[in-house]
Amino acid sequence: MIKIILISLALIFVIIGALISALAAIGLLRLEDVYSRAHAAGKASTLGAMSLLFGTFLYFIATQGFVNMQLIVAIIFVLITGPLSSHMIMKAAYNIKTPYTKKTKVDEISEDLKDTKL
């Protein structure tokens, strides 16, 4: 009974992760500037990849009966590097003065960086 529940939960997490990753891909195609695209990639794809890995983790627990430490390390790695990489992409784009979309009205970064040099 527990095995069926764990496999069902694993399937749900894999489907949710695939849907979130697909939404991130759509966001990369539809959004207008590099900042919005990096935001979509950093947030949604990180959550999608973590859901996929957690579903795989649950599947291994249900079918093989042990905890796969490689998946735990991969989940932690994605959790740390996904948002960090999108932040660095946006920071590099800001430093080379990549233009915003016309809908962007506020530049909060310039207000924060008046006294500091990047």
Swiss-Prot record:
Keyword Disulfide bond part of the UniProt annotation: no
Keywords: Antiport, Cell membrane, Hydrogen ion transport, Ion transport, Membrane, Sodium, Sodium transport, Transmembrane, Transmembrane helix, Transport
Classification via InterPro entries: PhaG_MnhG_YufB
Topological relation to the membrane, as annotated: Multi-pass membrane protein
Residues that span the membrane, as ranges: 7-29, 44-66, 71-90
Quaternary data: May form a heterooligomeric complex that consists of seven subunits: mnhA1, mnhB1, mnhC1, mnhD1, mnhE1, mnhF1 and mnhG1.
Family statement: Belongs to the CPA3 antiporters (TC 2.A.63) subunit G family.
Protein name from the UniProt record: Na(+)/H(+) antiporter subunit G1
Species per Swiss-Prot/TrEMBL record: Staphylococcus aureus
Source organism phylogeny: Bacteria, Bacillati, Bacillota, Bacilli, Bacillales
